[in-house]
Amino acid sequence: MKTVSIFGSTGAIGQMIIDIIFADLDKYQVKVLVAKSNVQLLAFQAKLINAERVVIANVDLYQELKDLLVGTNIKVSAGDSGMVMATSLDVDYAMMAIVGMAALIPMTYLINSGIKVIALANKESIVCGGTLLLSLAKEKNVNIVPVDSEHNAIYQILSSSKKNLEKITLTASGGPLLSMDYDQIKNVTVQDTVKHPIWKMGKKISVDSATMINKSLEIIEAYYFFSIKAEKLDIIIHPESIIHAIVSYVDGASIAFMSVPDMKIPIMYTLSWPDRSAILCKKLNLASCNQLTFIKPDVYKFPGIKLGFEVLKTSNVHANSIILNAANEVAVDAFLNKKIRFLDIVSVVCETLNLVNYGRINSLSSILDCDLVSRRVASSAIDKLY
């Protein structure tokens, strides 16, 4: 029986792994579920899969969660102390699905705990942690297996052939605004941006997909995760989301990774790694794929897609990656709370990148400081807009 910890269990990815585990409960023992504030769903999940412990990040919700679990043997913790406890448990596998920069410190704790496998559904911890985080994982002999469909696809392809690479291409669905013209995009609402045509995702990543800054973050993630030069990375719009990544070699051959667009497939891969297990999901039927479309990204309509490449051209990639991520998180939050318009998101990110000139990143504290400075500048930029 595989022992499992799930961080961010009430989010979109967290709910999917809960479904997978519930369908095969005799194979998994869930040691802890961690969530930010959704106590009702967290309590339901814990009872459903008989989790040993739960942690709620918001300490004000501790008693409510405890009351919901009266009559069970499930242990309840909250806040930072609960997070430290959760990351120190002896488990075979941890799913890191906390959204945004908030995942970085728990990721560091997990790696230091000596866990063997972390399934990473959080690109921001790699974008911001960079080589510091990955070097720590290597030192501790921790295997980080990416959950993002594109990076999971690249990971699987490169597991058989890493030599003589010419290019790695990440595909992008194009998001919910792909078919709109620029004038339409100027006036989109929050509801327009969170309705992704292909993937089931949370609000933040749905907005990132709409601005295509998500793809910029993924380019930086690939740069770090696969130790590949920026000039060997590319993006292609592929609305059907059947091909998730393409690895091209110097001999003219390319290997494409294909599956139906279902995040349960890469999640199951990480759960079974280094083996493979069957999963109840729709399988790819090539005969039903009437066409596969590929479109060059339109950087005029979606300027956010080029920011990752621009960051990778700078002399201080690590700091600028942190600045990009921090400004984006602040701007997306402002958009979701209807404080700014959709096109303001990229404007705020660009202004923050121009204004913040941070020094060398050489420690976790410098990462956190750069993040904090960038958030303040981004917030100030937003305040000046209206």
From Swiss-Prot:
HAMAP family assigned: DXP_reductoisom
Entry keywords, A to Z: Isoprene biosynthesis, Manganese, Metal-binding, NADP, Oxidoreductase
Gene for this chain: dxr
EC number: 1.1.1.267
Stretches that traverse the bilayer: none
SUPFAM superfamilies: 1-deoxy-D-xylulose-5-phosphate reductoisomerase, C-terminal domain (SSF69055), Glyceraldehyde-3-phosphate dehydrogenase-like, C-terminal domain (SSF55347), NAD(P)-binding Rossmann-fold domains (SSF51735)
Biological-process GO terms, alphabetical: isopentenyl diphosphate biosynthetic process, methylerythritol 4-phosphate pathway involved in terpenoid biosynthetic process
Binding site for NADPH: T10, G11, I13, N38, N122, E124, G202
InterPro entries in the record: DXP_reductoisomerase (IPR003821), DXP_reductoisomerase_C (IPR013644), DXP_reductoisomerase_N (IPR013512), DXPR_C (IPR026877), DXPR_C_sf (IPR036169), NAD(P)-bd_dom_sf (IPR036291)
Catalytic activity entry: 2-C-methyl-D-erythritol 4-phosphate + NADP(+) = 1-deoxy-D-xylulose 5-phosphate + NADPH + H(+)
Protein name: 1-deoxy-D-xylulose 5-phosphate reductoisomerase
Lineage: Bacteria, Pseudomonadati, Pseudomonadota, Alphaproteobacteria, Rickettsiales
Function: Catalyzes the NADPH-dependent rearrangement and reduction of 1-deoxy-D-xylulose-5-phosphate (DXP) to 2-C-methyl-D-erythritol 4-phosphate (MEP).
Protein's pathway: Isoprenoid biosynthesis; isopentenyl diphosphate biosynthesis via DXP pathway; isopentenyl diphosphate from 1-deoxy-D-xylulose 5-phosphate: step 1/6
Positions contributing to Mn(2+) binding: D148, E150, E218
